[in-house]
Amino acid sequence: MPGHALRTFQEMGMYGCPRTAKSLNATMKVLLRARMFDEALSLFEEGPEKYDVEVDDISCNTVVKMFCDMGDLRAAYRVMQGMERAGLRSDVITYMTLMAAFYKCGRHEVGDGLWNLMRLRGWVPTLATYNVRIQFLVNRGRGWQANEMARKIYVAGIKPDEITYNLIIKGFFMMGEHEMAKTVFGAMHGRGCKPNSKVYQTMVHYLCERRDFDLAFRLCKDSMEKNWFPSVDTINQLLKGLMAISKDRNGKEIMKLVTGRKPSYSYGEMKVFKDILSHRKTGR
């Protein structure tokens, strides 16, 4: 498929179809998803001369993302610098992509610098860029600061989304602030944001770790009834916990929902679930 997309772009001229930045960008994105980095970079570099197509800001942002995925952050930053020399203005997406990459590899001073540079150049942060900052704070164990940032963006008229709340909840759980995590989860509804499958997964996982199996059961059941199933490991942990506190009936309810899942779990996974329940019955 990626090779076919590349050939189609290369042969467009043979069929009287003019190549455009839009067709170049579409081809590059297909190559990027297939992790065909060399081919995507060649297309970007050869575009203006070989194919008579001028790259645009989307082309550059695609290459920035590619270098970030490759772990070559210096090259990614150079692409942003090259944009300005070419008369193209780096945008919020450029900065967000770079910030996320630098934060992820622990170079927070560069990430903070990019944030400040973005603001100085007149770009208004989007929710996605705020989420990148919140992710960084959570990873650094600064859950309270992450929560404060979420509060500020809400006051500023930017509505936090499921990603924001999931990060804040995870941040509080990681700090041991379990009650705050549950408070944030409860506050989602009041602020017009319903939890999605990832939020449920986070809640059930950490509640099981804290051995709050009653609430974990209720949330897991609610999630499964929406056809959102936590990870196999989380379900295993919940079933073991319910059996340990003699909540056999709750375990059976979870098992009933698990059995009705489409697509179904594998034979091996189902066997593990059943074994957990049977161990309680046999006293093992």
Give the ranges of each region predicted by the language model:
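TPR/TPR-like (Sel1-like) alpha-helical repeat modules
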Residues: K221-F229, L239-S246, E253-S264
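Pentatricopeptide repeat
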Residues: A5, T20-N25, K29, A40, ...
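Inter-helix linker motif
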Residues: G16, R35, Y51-D52, G71, ...
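Alpha-helical solenoid repeat scaffolds, predominantly canonical TPR units
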Residues: T8, L43, V79, L114, ...
